[in-house]
Amino acid sequence: MKQALRVAVSFFMLWAAVLHAEVRIEITQGVDSARPIGVVPFQWAGPGAAPEDIGGIVAADLRNSGKFNPLDRSRLPQQPGTAQEVQPAAWSALGIDAVVVGQVTPSPDGDYNVTYQLVDTGGAPGTVLAQNTYKVNKKWLRYAGHTASDEVFEKLTGIKGAFRTRIAYVVQTNGGQFPYELRVSDYDGYNQFTVHRSPQPLMSPAWTPDGSKLAYVTFESGRSALVIQTLSNGAVRQVASFPRHNGAPAFSPDGSKLAFALSKTGSLNLYVMDVGSGQIRQVTDGRSNNTEPTWFPDSQNLAFTSDQAGRPQVYKVNVNGGTPQRITWEGSQNQDADVSSDGKTMVMVSSAGGQQHIAKQDLVTGGVQVLSSTFLDETPSLAPNGTMVIYSSSQGMGSVLNLVSTDGRFKARLPATDGQVKSPAWSPYL
């Protein structure tokens, strides 16, 4: 935990946060069918009000995953502060088989000790399933809450938690000298800061696998160009600025390659650059449009959008050569896919019956499930553990970000108050 906090602190110490109206989650569909769990407000052992609602952070994280339905605070049968105070029978009577309790205690040096316990109230009543204590300063209290969420989530599901991750996205503000901004925030919209401002459009942010850099498209030179920016010091390196279109960057999971789309020869095709040498080679050819690459976990195969059959569909191709294979067949068109880190599923924009929604496809069975119910949905991006999807949709005259769990149980909106928000990209584990 201490190492994780040091990494996070160094990440932000090198970037002074720029204050904006932050993107915050508003629930649009709950998770009544998910696993019930108790999350008790953490006891505050200091004077006045608690500096942060850690219990609320943990409950929100678990709810956002779609896998848990935290019991409403008004229905809690008791509010214990420690594992010893938990009365298992009171919880099991409500169908709750696990309860999170915790404490926040100020330390003499001005920091805070955040402690949690995950208590079994079902199979082995009273057993502590997981526990930890973190010492953090006030700025990192939310991070401590997300860390507790990650540990609780993994203990109960066997899936690594992704609540300490971040999202990058583009905001178009109303007027000003630099109306386009590339921003980064925690996955839930808190701790937002600006990476880059521009008088011209910014598009398609993509994270390096270690989370230290972002690739994106800029038009500041008068035409599209692909750049990579280091988050720790702001250094920008241009990697592609060919005639016509340069876009849709995507780093391979092993970090050795960057895929993108170019139209320098007329048709829009996929290319792959060796990150170390800068050498670029063409992957697709022909007169069709081939774009929006996303990597499979082997760092050798790409899923991408192509209109070679008339309408956009998702295909798979090996970057070392071979014939692309179509992998989407349901709906009138499918595009802008994102493959999960285990390679078993992908999310995409799927159109059918005049509707454009986010859908999930099982890459083994081919089964498709529509996840979203918003309007003109686009640019889905998966959490690194594959449990949540962030995407943009149209609302009124603008665009907002939305969150949906990959089982479709939980849906939320992240409304922006100072501009249109689009092109979200979920970070790797940080």
Swiss-Prot record:
Q: Domain of life of the organism in this record? A: Bacteria
Cite a single Pfam family from the UniProt record.
TolB_N
Q: What is the lineage of its organism?
A: Bacteria, Pseudomonadati, Pseudomonadota, Gammaproteobacteria, Enterobacterales
Q: Which UniProt keywords apply?
A: Cell cycle, Cell division, Periplasm, Signal
- Encoding gene (name): tolB
Q: Does the keyword Transport apply?
A: no
One Gene Ontology BP term is:
protein import
Give the signal peptide as a residue range, or say none if absent.
1-21
An annotated GO cellular component of this protein is:
periplasmic space
Cell membrane listed as a keyword = no
Describe the family membership recorded for this protein in Swiss-Prot or TrEMBL.
Belongs to the TolB family.
Which PANTHER family does the protein's record reference?
Answer: PROTEIN TOLB, PROTEIN TOLB HOMOLOG
Give the residues annotated as coiled coil.
Answer: none
Please report the name of this protein according to its UniProt entry. Answer: Tol-Pal system protein TolB
Kindly state the subunit structure of this protein.
The Tol-Pal system is composed of five core proteins: the inner membrane proteins TolA, TolQ and TolR, the periplasmic protein TolB and the outer membrane protein Pal. They form a network linking the inner and outer membranes and the peptidoglycan layer.
Q: Where in the cell is it found?
A: Periplasm
Purpose: Part of the Tol-Pal system, which plays a role in outer membrane invagination during cell division and is important for maintaining outer membrane integrity. TolB occupies a key intermediary position in the Tol-Pal system because it communicates directly with both membrane-embedded components, Pal in the outer membrane and TolA in the inner membrane.
